[in-house]
UniProtKB/Swiss-Prot annotation:
Function: Produces ATP from ADP in the presence of a proton gradient across the membrane. The catalytic sites are hosted primarily by the beta subunits.
Protein name (record): ATP synthase subunit beta
Source species: Mannheimia succiniciproducens (strain KCTC 0769BP / MBEL55E)
Main location class: membrane
Binding site for ATP: G148, G149, A150, G151, V152, G153, K154, T155
EC nos: 7.1.2.2
InterPro entries: AAA+_ATPase (IPR003593), ATP-synt_VA_C (IPR055190), ATP_synth_F1_bsu (IPR005722), ATPase_a/bsu_AS (IPR020003), ATPase_alpha/beta_chains (IPR050053), ATPase_F1/V1/A1_a/bsu_N (IPR004100), ATPase_F1/V1/A1_a/bsu_N_sf (IPR036121), ATPase_F1/V1/A1_a/bsu_nucl-bd (IPR000194)
Keywords: ATP synthesis, ATP-binding, Cell inner membrane, Cell membrane, CF(1), Hydrogen ion transport, Ion transport, Membrane, Nucleotide-binding, Translocase, Transport
Length: 458
């Protein structure tokens, strides 16, 4: 173990001088002797000086402090001992439940699986959320992105997915909280405890108030834990909230390291950083990682470089829309903007495909007619168009659903709707079986039977 000393401190960026013959490698972890702060080497500047990012607050550091080289990258505990625990970016427990006691530690920087190791899957993963199962179905071992601006329900949707999938699915899950609110992390912990699934989830948090180094690396820490479960032959769920904060931390670090910014001030290495993370989130012939990632969309602009870079890596995209949220329809998923590679007759079957496309067709037609209705009113429409509008409004409302995790706010019990019931319900609306039922009956219910029941009491 070689020793060096701090020569410069600029916020979270720290320069350390080592003897010329013992300069640490890029990504090596260094330890400050006083206080035990971990640093990660980012650049070698020449003359024995390395530039590092602090994995914690740099308060109280001063020039001349001794720093030792661990000779290896940041390593975190992996395996079943991490289940039910809350850890930070370094894999240290933050839940006051004693040491993790894992038998094995893995470095957080790893190679992505090679081309021949990867496997593709077309098996569907049922979520119990109507709009998702119908319009943008998830694949087991696939990657899903939840896109949305501020306050349209990304985290609530994520929590509902975790509740539905983690409870129905008996495997293990890893949750990486990347630069999100500590309150949400706390809520999530209690939600898992109340649902009795905490012993199947590993939690890794690097919250909003932490330095950029923590937020940049915490996604890799969580991913490393998920990879261990996958390599043991399990099917793992990997949840990330929020991928945008990972990009943002990269932007902060990049600026501190003195790189020239690119479009909109993002780091020049944006696509590469995203690729390094996303290429590791993949299923192999041994086991699968199904990942659900929340993606914040700055100023509701999907063409912003950060969400646009994320799009390329995903199998399903669930786009949450402020317009739909403003109508009081939750989950506020936009059925015309959301996509899935699984929505193919050879994967989901002809009936599911036809119903999904039929629903999108009617909603698209309604969208086109809205301008005419706004100017001339409903009376000027042809009988056929009036029917389209009536059915579209019913479909819009039937796409809403009460969530288990939102019971406290809505006061109505959550509903899990099977894919079979979802297809049957929407097929009935498209075929005109429910034309006689008022549209209010379709709002915030589970299956189509509940609509019929609700209509009787109206």
């Amino acid at each position: 173990m070689s020793a060096g000393k701090i020569v410069q401190i600029i916020g979270a960026v720290i320069d350390v001088e080592f003897p010329e013959n013992a300069v640490p490698k890029v990504y090596d972890a260094l330890k400050v002797a006083e206080g035990g702060l971990t640093l990660e080497v980012q650049q070698q500047l020449g003359g024995g000086i390395v530039r590092c990012i602090a994995m914690g607050s740099s308060d109280g550091l001063k020039r001349g402090l001794s720093v030792s080289n661990t000779g290896k990258p940041i390593s975190v505990p992996v395996g079943t001992k991490t289940l039910g625990r809350i850890m930070n970016v370094l894999g240290e427990p933050v839940d006051e439940q004693g040491p993790i006691g894992a038998e094995e530690e893995w470095a957080i920087h790893r190679e992505a699986p090679s081309y021949e190791e990867q496997s593709n899957s077309t098996e569907l993963l049922e979520t119990g959320i109507k709009v998702i199962d119908l319009i943008c179905p998830f694949a087991k071992g696939g990657k899903v992105g939840l896109f949305g601006g501020a306050g349209v329900g990304k985290t609530v949707n994520m929590m509902e997915l975790i509740r539905n999938i983690a409870i129905e699915h008996s495997g293990f899950s890893v949750f990486a909280g990347v630069g999100e609110r500590t309150r949400e992390g706390n809520d999530f912990y209690h939600e898992m405890t109340d649902s009795n699934v905490l012993d199947k989830v590993s939690l890794v948090y690097g919250q909003m108030n932490e330095p950029p180094g923590n937020r940049l690396r915490v996604a890799l820490t969580g991913l490393t834990m998920a990879e261990k479960f996958r390599d043991e032959g399990r099917d793992v769920l990997f949840f990330v909230d929020n991928i945008y904060r990972y990009t943002l931390a990269g932007t902060e670090v990049s600026a501190l390291l003195g790189r020239m910014p690119s479009a909109v001030g993002y780091q020049p290495t944006l696509a590469e950083e995203m690729g390094v993370l996303q290429e590791r989130i993949t299923s192999t012939k041994t086991g699968s990682i199904t990942s659900v990632q929340a993606v914040y969309v700055p100023a509701d602009d999907l063409t912003d470089p950060s969400p646009a870079t994320t799009f390329a890596h995903l199998d399903s995209t669930v786009v949450l829309s402020r317009n739909i949220a403003s109508l009081g329809i939750y989950p506020a998923v936009d059925p015309l903007d959301s996509t899935s590679r699984q929505l193919d007759p050879q994967v989901v079957g002809q009936e599911h495909y036809d119903v999904a496309r039929g629903v999108q067709g009617i909603l698209q037609r309604y969208k086109e007619l809205k301008d005419i209705i706004a100017i001339l009113g409903m009376d000027e429409l042809s009988e056929d168009d009036k029917l389209v509008v009536a059915r579209a409004r019913k479909i819009e409302r039937f796409l809403s659903q009460p969530f288990f995790v939102a019971e406290v706010f809505t006061g109505s019990p959550g509903k899990y709707v099977s894919l079979k019931d979802t297809i049957r319900g929407f097929k009935g609306i498209l075929e005109g079986e429910y034309d006689h039922i008022p549209e209010q009956a379709f709002y915030m219910v589970g299956s189509i039977e509940e609509v019929v029941e609700k209509a009787k009491n109206m």
